[in-house]
Each structure stands twice: as C-alpha cells, then as structure tokens.
Amino acid sequence: MAELACFCYPHLEKDSYKFIPFNSLAIKCMLTAKVDKKDQDKFYNSIVYGIAPPPQFKKRYNTNDNSRGMNFETSMFNKVAILICEALNSIKVTQSDVANVLSRVVSVRHLENLVLRKENHQDVLFHSKELLLKAVLIAIGQSKEIETTATAEGGEIVFQNAAFTMWKLTYLDHKLMPILDQNFIEYKITLNEDKPISDACVKELVAELRWQYNRFAVITHGKGHYRVVKYSSVANHADRVFATYKNNAKSGNVTDFNLLDQRIIWQNWYAFTSSMKQGNTLDVCKKLLFQKMKQEKNPFKGLSTDRKMDEVSHVGI
C-alpha cells in the first residue's frame, strides 16, 4: 500500500491540476536528503532531477534500510506512476480536492496488475483506453463504482459462471512489490456486472468454493468483491481491514463497507465486519473470528458441506 503522493505531484493549470509522475533519480535524491521536520509533508525539490515525494513517505520505498517498500528504480514503477497520472488527468481535480486525493492510500499490487492487463494484447484493457482509465479510477478510489470483472485487477481466471469470475492472484511474479512468501496463495472473486444475481449462480459459486477451496475462508474488504484467503491469514486481513476502515472514518473518506452476500462470506468474517460497522473495538471484533458459530440453516437445498476425507480438495495444501 502507498499514498498517491508517492507516485506523482500536482501542477496547477488555470482552475485545476495536472499530475506529473516522479522519476526515480528525484526519489533517490529525496531519500538521501536531510529535511527539517516542519517540511516533511511538503514535496521535495531535488534541484537536479525535479520534484520528489514528501520525505514523510520515505518508508514507502525499498532501500538498504527498508526492504518492505516499493522497488522504485524498476520500469514498473514508471509505468504505474504514468498510469495513475493518465487517470487523474482525465478528470478535473480542484484545489479543494487535491490534498484529499494525494493522501489516499492505494494498493500498489492492484495497480501493477492493471499495467500487466494493459500490456496484454489479448485483454480488453489493451483495446479500450476508456475502460482502462475507469479501472484505474476505481483502483485509486476516485470512482464510486465497484471493481467488476472487466475492470478487475486481473490474474489467472480459475472459475467463471454467468455472474462471477474467480481470479488467482499473481503477486509472486510482481516487480514493484512482490510477495516474497513462496507459499502465498490467494484468490479474488469479482461480479461480472453490478446487478442482482440469481440464486442459481450463487449456488454454483458456493458449490465450487466448498468443493475445491474448502481450506480457504471467503472474506471481503468491503469494496464489492470477495477474497478467498488461507485461514492462517485471516487475522492479518482483519487487522488491515479494521485499520483502513478507521482511517477512512477519521479522514472523512467514508464509503459504505459492502458486507456482500452472507451465503457466500465465511460466517465468522461476516460477524467480524458487522461488529466493526457497529463501532466496536478491534479486540471485540476479532474475538468473533475465533468463536464457534451456530451453524446456519443451509440456504441451498441439496448442497452439503460434509465431505469424506478422500473427497476434500487439495488446493492450498
């Protein structure tokens, strides 16, 4: 995750802003600079290489002292920064909005995936600039629309029916912020269209998840799509979701947290997010993740959760 101010800076033109991507040498210069505390939140002028990000975001970049940041000296950083600027320059951002826009925290991996989709000649985003910009505006929180299959971050499609598409995420292969844990495996489920879904389509998806992905929990980060994650990573997702929800509420970026379909979401996660929306503390909410829930009546007749051991999926082992 990183603020948009880590990728570009605003230049005032008449009554709105044009956004310009940073170059890696300007960032490198900022990372070595001694900057007064009162200027930590201001864009840094490298004199030689142009404007650089505010020094308060130093930890967002990979250095000898910090291996958890972005690999900003890669060509992928330039591609992501340019894509963000193209999207922001396609809309009007006024003086009253610019600080709020640049402080927004976005998923770096999501944006890298959109670059990969843009470069894939077989992908619809390669052929439609309009759809590509729409996908980026959704990714950076500048659009109220949800991420549907056409505008999704992408990955490898492992399941699809008339209503849903399930993607295996490919973060292990990334250049900007690759996941280094070789055991990482995670999926995302997007809606093909943002419209009511038939029970038959939901039943098909639930059957697929119970049969093939029973070692995973189906959760949501509240943005209109599902995530299918290992049970061992659920607590980590809970910390991130709670922190983001609270930060958004604090900064005034209040968006409705979409709980999605209770028949698909893991029961304990639904309880956690419902409790979070009610204003409870993280500790109170997280207890619900590890609590034995009363089994709800199966909403789909004839769809059993009981499996013999030799029938259980080996995905995720």
From Swiss-Prot:
It comes from the Viruses. Residues 205-241 are annotated as: RNA-binding. It is an enzyme of class 3 (hydrolase). ATP binds at S107, V108, R109, K188, H221, G222, K223, R227. Pfam families: Rota_NS35_C, Rota_NS35_N. Keywords: ATP-binding, Host cytoplasm, Hydrolase, Magnesium, Metal-binding, Nucleotide-binding, RNA-binding. One of its GO terms (molecular function) is metal ion binding. The active site is at H225. Its EC number is 3.6.4.-. It is found in: Host cytoplasm. One of its GO terms (biological process) is viral genome replication. Its main location: host cell. SUPFAM superfamilies: Rotavirus NSP2 fragment, C-terminal domain (SSF75347), Rotavirus NSP2 fragment, N-terminal domain (SSF75574). InterPro entries: Rota_NS35_C, Rota_NS35_N, Rotavirus_NSP2, Rotavirus_NSP2_C, Rotavirus_NSP2_N. Its cofactor is Mg(2+). GO terms for cellular component: host cell cytoplasm. Participates in replication and packaging of the viral genome. Plays a crucial role, together with NSP5, in the formation of virus factories (viroplasms), which are large inclusions in the host cytoplasm where replication intermediates are assembled and viral RNA replication takes place. Displays ssRNA binding, NTPase, RNA triphosphatase (RTPase) and ATP-independent helix-unwinding activities. The unwinding activity may prepare and organize plus-strand RNAs for packaging and replication by removing interfering secondary structures. Homooctamer. Interacts with VP1; this interaction is weak. Interacts with NSP5; this interaction leads to up-regulation of NSP5 phosphorylation and formation of viral factories. Interacts with host DCP1A, DCP1B, DDX6, EDC4 and EIF2S1/eIF2-alpha; these interactions are probably part of the sequestration of some host SGs and PBs proteins in viral factories. Belongs to the rotavirus NSP2 family. This is Non-structural protein 2. It comes from Rotavirus A (strain RVA/Pig/United States/OSU/1977/G5P9[7]). The lineage of its organism: Viruses, Riboviria, Orthornavirae, Duplornaviricota, Resentoviricetes.
